[in-house]
Amino acid sequence: MQIILLEKVANLGNLGEVVRVRDGYARNFLIPQKKARRATDAALKEFEARRAELEKVQAEKLAAAQALAERLNGFQLKISQKAGVDGRLFGSVTNADVAEGLRKAGFEAVEKSQVRMPNGQIKAVGEYPVQAVLHADVVADVVVLVEGEMA
């Protein structure tokens, strides 16, 4: 399926590019998320008419993401979980837990889908690096400090 990208999409293209993707990817993800629309003649004409407006919106989103990343870079998030005497957690700390902790710390714009945990879920007490992908071009590094509570 041919689509027009309405914003920058990682590993696919930039705003305004016409690309070919699988039908399911377009119908189930890109179009419902308002990241793309079908590349018909009418849609191409409408896009060219609205191009400046869409570029302005993209620039605003990028600026907001960069401002949030400046505040978020190097931030140390403390999470307490029940743990055994050997330091292993009962359960684990997931990206949803990290996103919730960041929201409570005043970073409301961070969603769980934006949190990347390079080593997977955290299952022991300690310090762990985590990334928050705020925009296709903006990534913030956060340190998660997991403290154990005696069960």
UniProtKB/Swiss-Prot annotation:
Give me any GO biological process, just one: translation
Q: Which UniProt keywords apply?
A: Ribonucleoprotein, Ribosomal protein, RNA-binding, rRNA-binding
Q: Which residues form a coiled coil?
A: none
InterPro entries, A to Z: Ribosomal_bL9, Ribosomal_bL9/RNase_H1_N, Ribosomal_bL9_bac/chp, Ribosomal_bL9_C, Ribosomal_bL9_C_sf, Ribosomal_bL9_N, Ribosomal_bL9_N_sf
Supply the SUPFAM superfamilies for this chain: L9 N-domain-like, Ribosomal protein L9 C-domain
GO cellular component terms attached to this protein's record: ribonucleoprotein complex; ribosome
Q: Which Pfam families match?
A: Ribosomal_L9_C, Ribosomal_L9_N
GO MF terms listed in the record are: rRNA binding; structural constituent of ribosome
Q: Which family does it belong to?
A: Belongs to the bacterial ribosomal protein bL9 family.
Q: What does this protein do?
A: Binds to the 23S rRNA.
User: What is the name of this protein?
Assistant: Large ribosomal subunit protein bL9
Task: Tell me the organism.
Answer: Bordetella parapertussis (strain 12822 / ATCC BAA-587 / NCTC 13253)
Q: Gene that codes for this?
A: rplI
